[in-house]
């Protein structure tokens, strides 16, 4: 293992210096099998494209037969890796990960990929998602005297693979066994000495795509959380890995089979609304185009008599353009985003916090002065930063501020890999629209309906998980977890 020097990256910032006022993604995974290529460098670029899915830590494991080298650390991909480190990571198979965690679990031990030694050799695992039976799995492993070194469910899946191998199963059987023991959301990329594996849970809640890269007359296979990870290395998108599907990639090519007994798609609709990059495809559909369509639908459902339409950078912009197009109202770039504000700047004073919104977004006074504006955003979670944003717009001279949200109200927490608050902290779970309108200080507020959100997709509307909007969870949540939103991140041995 290459020695690392942990980099502190423990400050949260967005629209002010508090936690972002929207759900936060948990992870991005990227892997490829490409003998003769610089797989670590390719994985680096893939993770760089997936940086929006996790900014806390990053890691890459590289295999050459039974030999594996791993480098992971706290920080952004560009902070964790440099040319010298990548040069040391030589091999034919790479598994990479970029991570966002919930509060309290920000430590190097939880960075991925998870790496364990088994009877058949090393296994490296990268995971996007969250299990809901983590307490049960953890207790089972501790009862067998396994020494757990992290507070992640990803380590539990890796240990389940190790146990199955110890019982005599081959890699394929062991990975399938671990998947069957795991309940919840998981998209996995797994490196072993003999193959690269990729799989999704039976509901396919978290995304995983397959791509190909032509090199020296050979077809190489790539796995990524999003197609933008394929684009950056020049790989072609082939298809999404199906719910409950597993693929195995070796020198012989690609094998695919369904390990789940009755897969039932329940894709995370928030991937389409916000999480995934707008230049990615979601099951073959352009997310930029989808977000423009939901903006158009929002304009139909909740028009506004205004002079200008603005989008909250960056995620609110496509919907704002669609809203503007549908109503024939000019779209304006009235908010300038400072793209160099991140999670590693100096701790602010309280006075800085009170005016901190301008560290990330600065209104253009000459655009906004004397104008009635509609501001479009993808979601409201707590309402804290929305209130600050509205105040900043009024201070810049806007005479009216009407807010439109391109998703339904978030009323329930996510248990499948998205960092949301407990239900009592979700503003739409405890307040009416009129109360939220008053609290954040807008002249009017409206949300896209759930029907409008789903009808704008090209997928069957029954194929989505919409639990954060209606509480209908596709995978049963244990009551003790539902009451407290106690995920493994907060469990200690």
Swiss-Prot record:
Record note on cofactor: Binds 1 Mg(2+) ion per subunit. Binds 1 [4Fe-4S] cluster per subunit.
> What is any one GO biological process for this UniProt entry?
'de novo' IMP biosynthetic process
Q: Where is the active site?
A: 27 (nucleophile)
Q: Which GO terms describe its molecular function?
A: 4 iron, 4 sulfur cluster binding; amidophosphoribosyltransferase activity; magnesium ion binding
Pathway field of the UniProt record reads:
Purine metabolism; IMP biosynthesis via de novo pathway; N(1)-(5-phospho-D-ribosyl)glycinamide from 5-phospho-alpha-D-ribose 1-diphosphate: step 1/2
Identify the PROSITE patterns for this entry.
GATASE_TYPE_2
Propeptide, chain numbering = 1-26
Catalysed reaction, written as an equation: 5-phospho-beta-D-ribosylamine + L-glutamate + diphosphate = 5-phospho-alpha-D-ribose 1-diphosphate + L-glutamine + H2O
Query: Using the chain's own numbering, where are the disulfide bonds?
Result: none
Keywords attached to this entry: 4Fe-4S, Glutamine amidotransferase, Glycosyltransferase, Iron, Iron-sulfur, Magnesium, Metal-binding, Purine biosynthesis, Transferase
Question: What EC number is given for this enzyme?
Answer: 2.4.2.14
Which Pfam family, an example, fits this chain? GATase_6
Outline the extent of the Glutamine amidotransferase type-2 domain.
27-252
What's this protein's family per the entry? In the C-terminal section; belongs to the purine/pyrimidine phosphoribosyltransferase family.
Q: What is this protein called?
A: Amidophosphoribosyltransferase
In the UniProt record, the gene name given for this protein reads: purF
């Amino acid at each position: 293992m290459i020695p690392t020097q942990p980099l502190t990256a423990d400050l949260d910032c967005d629209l002010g210096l508090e936690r972002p006022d929207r759900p936060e993604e948990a992870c991005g995974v990227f892997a490829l099998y490409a003998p003769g290529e610089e797989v670590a460098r390719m994985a680096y670029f893939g993770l760089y494209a997936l940086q929006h899915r996790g900014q806390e830590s990053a890691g890459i494991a590289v295999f050459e037969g039974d030999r594996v080298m791993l480098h992971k650390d706290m920080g952004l991909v560009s902070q964790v890796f440099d040319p010298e480190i990548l040069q040391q990571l030589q091999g034919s198979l790479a598994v990479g990960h970029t991570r966002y965690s919930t509060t309290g679990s920000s430590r190097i031990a939880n960075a991925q990929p998870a790496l364990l030694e088994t009877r058949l050799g090393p296994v490296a695992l990268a995971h996007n998602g969250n299990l809901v039976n983590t307490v049960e799995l953890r207790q089972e492993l501790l009862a067998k005297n396994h020494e757990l070194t992290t507070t992640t469910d990803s380590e539990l899946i890796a240990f389940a693979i190790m146990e199955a191998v110890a019982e005599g199963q081959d890699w394929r059987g062991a990975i399938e066994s671990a998947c069957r023991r795991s309940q919840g959301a998981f998209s996995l990329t797994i490196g072993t000495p003999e193959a690269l594996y990729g799989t999704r849970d039976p509901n396919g809640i978290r995304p995983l795509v397959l791509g190909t890269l032509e090199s020296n007359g050979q077809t190489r296979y790539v796995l990524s959380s999003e197609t933008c990870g394929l684009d950056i290395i020049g790989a072609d998108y082939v298809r999404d890995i199906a719910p409950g599907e597993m693929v195995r990639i070796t020198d012989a090519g690609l094998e695919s089979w369904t390990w789940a007994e009755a897969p039932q798609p329940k894709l995370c609709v928030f991937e389409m609304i916000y999480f995934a990059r707008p230049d990615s495809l979601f099951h073959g559909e352009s997310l930029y185009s989808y977000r423009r369509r939901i903006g158009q639908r929002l304009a139909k459902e909740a028009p506004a008599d205004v002079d200008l339409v603005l989008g909250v950078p960056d995620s609110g912009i496509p919907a704002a353009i669609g809203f503007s197009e549908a109503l024939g109202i000019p779209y304006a770039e009235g908010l300038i985003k400072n793209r160099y504000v991140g999670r590693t700047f100096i701790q602010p004073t309280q006075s800085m916090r009170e005016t901190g919104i301008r560290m990330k977004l600065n209104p253009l006074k000459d655009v906004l002065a004397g104008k009635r504006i509609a501001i479009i955003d993808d979601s409201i979670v707590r309402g804290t930063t929305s209130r600050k944003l509205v105040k900043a717009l009024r201070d810049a001279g806007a005479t009216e501020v009407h807010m439109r949200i391109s998703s339904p109200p978030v009323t329930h927490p996510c248990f499948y890999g998205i960092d949301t608050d407990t239900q009592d902290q979700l503003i739409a779970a405890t307040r009416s629209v009129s109360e939220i309108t008053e609290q954040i200080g807008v002249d009017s507020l409206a949300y896209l309906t759930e029907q409008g959100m789903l009808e704008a997709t090209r997928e069957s509307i029954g194929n989505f998980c919409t639990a954060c909007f209606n509480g209908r969870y596709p995978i049963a949540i244990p009551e003790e977890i539902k009451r407290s939103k106690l995920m493994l991140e907060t469990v200690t041995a």
